[in-house]
Amino acid sequence: AVQNSIANQFMVAEEENIDQPISKTTHTRYIVSGKRSFEAAKDYAGKNIAVLNYANNLSIGGAPFYAGAQEESLCRCSTLLPCLQAMKASFYHKHHELYSTKQMDFMGNDDLIYTPEVVVFKSDERTDPVYPRMMNREEWFKVNVITCAAPQMQIAKKYPSNYEDVIRARIKKILDVAAKEKNEVIILGAWGCGAFKNPKEVVARLFVDLLKNYNFEIVEFALATRNDVQGSAFTRALQRNKV
């Protein structure tokens, strides 16, 4: 499974244009849940599912052996980590070089990795995300993972004037790749809104605004929370857009 994913995964560089023609023909069902990403994806096993990985573009898998953020959880529960390790030179070393030569700052860039047929074989447990439970073999399922890093606003002194334009372009590339690869379901969420301190209101508004142009059957914003999601920025953004 890992060899197959590595053989078929690819990177889309910032400068690559993959615009998808806009022709809205599908009624999209939107869901906001408190689930974790793979927990949400499991409900659609058997469909072509894209899951957004809220990545760190310098460290492979974030800190998968001890931290408990979304990317680390994805890596511990699936075959994703060795696939990302295979992109060490083209993706991670590239970004180290760009940072060290000051060709890239905290805003990062639009590079992303598409990893198909990642096998999820452990439960994405909210009670103890560092030690997920092995699932029975018949419960395993596959997802397609899009690895893309949000701006690291936790180290920014102020928001640049083009902040929303950058976020919009990056989200559009994520959605374009998911659509081009014929995903029926996409699992999104509070991308970059944790440690990277991007504002949920902006991320939610731009996701919802752009998603109206795509033909996904189901979009689920999995917010990994025990709180009531009805008051979340994502629910409010959907209500404002009447979708």
Each language-model region and where it sits:
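Macrodomain-like recognition of ADP-ribose-binding/processing modules
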Residues: 1-243
